[in-house]
Amino acid sequence: MLEELSAALKAFLDDLAAAKLADRVLVLCFSEFGRRVQENGSGTDHGTAGPVYLAGPGVKAGLVGEAPKLLDLQDGDLKMTTDFRRVYASVLEDWLGLPSKPSLSGDFTKLPLFRG
């Protein structure tokens, strides 16, 4: 599945670059559910924590946040290491130029997600 996502994102970003629109677009990809560590008979069950991917020429390359520890679980789930609202606050304020507090109902520390 990740190979298909990668190919689709590359094609999309290549098309944006060809149209000279890539600098205006941010791709944010996430799932509403994570995966549990323990396998069952058909794979793994839905969990509570999962990754968020950002793509586009304005995004700083690299990983942000701390990887969850596979042996330090909370009721069988990975522990969240970065609150998704920190990602949203960063996108709202640093990419869209909007205040994040009204949308997120609180203040969340932004993450260094974007190039200068």
Where are these regions (language model features)?
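Feature marks hydrolase-like catalytic cores characterized by long aromatic- and Gly/Pro-rich stretches
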Residues: 1-116
